[in-house]
Amino acid sequence: MEKITEKILLEKSSTKTNKLDQIKTLNLSRMSLKSEDLPVPLLSKLCRLEKLDLSGNMLQKIPKGLRLPCLKILNCSNNDMEDVLSLEALTNLEELRLEDNLYLTVNDEHKVIFLLPNLRMFNGKDISSTAHHIRHGSTEILRKRVIGVWERDFSLPDPISAKSLAAVEKSFVNAACTQVKYGPNSLSDYTKWRVEKIAKEYLKSLTSSEEEERVADTTPTKENKTKACDVGGNSITSPQKRTRNNTDVVAEASPRKSSRLVSAAPVEASPRKSARVLNTPQKTQPVVSSPRKHARLTSAETPESSPRKSSRLENVTQKAASQTESPRKPGMSTPTSKQAKCESPRKQSKQSTAKMEKSTPRKTTKAKLQVPQEPVSLTPLHVLQCHSRQNDPDDFSTQLWACAFEPQQDDSIDISGGSQTIATCGGETLCVINCESGLVLKKYKVPGEDFFSLAWSTVLMSRTGGSARPCNILAAGGKRGCVKLIHPRVNLAFGEFRVSRRAISIMRFNPRKPTFLFTGTYDKKIFLWDIGGLDQDYNFKISKLLTLETSSTPLHLALLPSSPDTHLLSGCDEGLYCFDVQLSKNTLKRNEEIEIVFPIYKKNDKKNNYRTIDGLSFLSDDVVASKSHMQGSIYLWSWSATRASWNSRKKEVPAVILAELQWSSTDIPYLSLGTCPGYGYVVCGDEQGRLWMYHITDTMMENFKSGKTISATEVLQWPSPIRAGKGALEGPSINSTAMDPGLHYLVALTDKNMVVVWKRESH
């Protein structure tokens, strides 16, 4: 049965008429239309159509041959668009929306702006100046470089024949695409496309000149006219071929670029559902099911249902969390955390780096840790529900995935190294929270996004007539595969860039080089980016430095605290890998250097291979805490001893285990752990809302020789917040935890839209 008929077109029109050629506005949104469902002969009768809404469908391209000569406004947001070249026929477009098309990149955006000569509004923004540069600004530069390639290495064949000319054209185009470089690497696809067009046009102009010299009277060129209905007595012809150009505009980072907010609710399935890595996100399911695995899927019918279990419709008493500041209001200063008494932080641990025998399952060499001997005491301070979709107070299904404390700058008053400000993400929102007051200082919302990861960094911002000043920025990403860059202090989302067509699973800044950002994606890759510094207008330049190939989805990234520029550890869905990330080497694409394997892998279990590393963090310069799904414990192991035992002829190296910490026996995956190196703490939440805390002191390290499993120092019970009229809430799963460096606060994120803040008791 045809989805689009003449009757439907007349019904969907805002113009009350019985003639197709009188329709000026047409709404075909949310009809589950595919490209083949658009009948070209029928739609071509809409010769006076000016505004068309095709949002919320499953279109991959605009059908070939569709001519809408009067169309000025087109909305193709929230589709499956892959081919923007199909839009070239709509030459009179002035306004176009392509948000929420997962497969489109910044290269496609540049192509669209170039192909549509009258386009002035793109995704709701005025692009007049950008479009002028894309269409005209850099044509001569590219053209001169292409001509230089021709004059240096090529000439016309003599005599000219179709076969010889085709061979020359192929060689010339390939050489030009290879040799001509312009703009950032992120625009290489667009640049190559432009260079190919310019090279072909230049060669065609040479052959035309050659023909004119040989033939006295020229043959008139046949004009190709586009058929169109007569509007006002004037036929509409296709424009002459335009000279196309590249751009040196900073890729993927327009100044003061806000997070692209869209009104249409997306319907794509999240990449963190059942199979963990979706091959093709589908839009046929109205339910947005968030992360990550079979065990966490639910049968609940609410639109954003929890992927783990059936949704328990529970609420929580909010403390000062319902009043949140609008993200577009003038920014308020991020408060500095108040001073608090703290013990002296841990010094760098000194580990033995002597080569270990492979047969030794547990390393008995003592790691010297200098941490406070007395454990801390924590009490629950706030339970916040601040990530609700559409501000729904009954939203207890949105999963919260990542949190991180704001870094303290060098001029901070707080000598303890602590911070009161934490960023949290989950669902469509990113929140910046003051742990002491429980106030949500800033809240950023991107409809249709599902944030999985975030990271803080302190970068330099240049100032006119003065020295550069440091500012804390926040990077966040998730299902859409784009990194959003935010300066919370001034309440500004200033840029974004696309990392992948698949979702972002994890991100981490290099603490030694604050502009270096690692991003892990669901297409089994880890990218290293340099976002550069910021100018006074928040312009920045993004460049890709490395591509690391993984065998499965990266879930956690950890840089060596003592040498973050040399090696990267990646906990993945199918193992723990180590990568060489030194930029002094020429190879820009790399595979893992070694795989670190654990004793749990030897356990015979047909249902689970225990290779999913869903927790990874450094406890000191050398001691690493990690765990596998279904393991029921946490390993502490030595990085230096493990690497020293590596035989370069083998990819696998057994981890040199220092201790095994008893944890919950749960089958729920992706319950990550956190560490506080300065106080020797490892913390991991479980499926009942409890927090297992391990205080790793010098005395405990002495006992590691026994090889016995060590119990938790303390297990913090779920605080059981009370919802008015409905009693206490059951404990949810704790997806993620974070502690500030001074261990003033411990924050836990749940799979039921609750942020729990614990505070250390002062003595």
From Swiss-Prot:
Sites where Phosphoserine occurs are at 270, 290
| Keywords in alphabetical order | Centromere, Chromatin regulator, Chromosome, Cytoplasm, Cytoskeleton, DNA replication, Kinetochore, Leucine-rich repeat, Nucleus, Phosphoprotein, Repeat, Telomere, WD repeat
The LRR repeats lie at 22-43, 48-69, 70-91, 92-113
UniProt-annotated location(s): Nucleus; Chromosome, Centromere; Chromosome, Telomere; Cytoplasm, Cytoskeleton, Microtubule organizing center, Centrosome
| Ranges where the record places region Disordered | 206-372
Q: Which residues carry this modification: Phosphothreonine?
A: 280
Any one Gene Ontology BP term: DNA replication
Q: Which GO terms describe its cellular component?
A: centrosome; chromosome, telomeric region; cytoplasm; kinetochore; nuclear origin of replication recognition complex; nucleus; pericentric heterochromatin
Cross-referenced InterPro entries, in alphabetical order? Leu-rich_rpt, LRR_dom_sf, LRR_LRWD1_dom, LRWD1, WD40/YVTN_repeat-like_dom_sf, WD40_repeat_CS, WD40_repeat_dom_sf, WD40_rpt
Q: What is its main location?
A: nucleus
Q: Which domain of life is it from?
A: Eukaryota
Q: Where is the composition biased (Polar residues)?
A: 277-288, 313-325
Quote the SMART domains the UniProt record gives. WD40
Q: Which Gene3D superfamilies match?
A: Ribonuclease Inhibitor, YVTN repeat-like/Quinoprotein amine dehydrogenase
List the Pfam families hit by this protein, alphabetically. LRR_LRWD1, WD_LRWD1
Q: How does it assemble?
A: Component of the ORC complex.
Per the entry's comment, what about the domains? The entire WD repeat region is required for the interaction with ORC complex components, as well as for association with chromatin and for binding to histone H3 and H4 trimethylation marks H3K9me3 and H4K20me3.
Q: Which family does it belong to?
A: Belongs to the LRWD1 family.
Q: Could you identify this protein by its name?
A: Leucine-rich repeat and WD repeat-containing protein 1
Query: What does UniProt list as this organism's lineage?
Result: Eukaryota, Metazoa, Chordata, Craniata, Vertebrata
Identify the coding gene: lrwd1
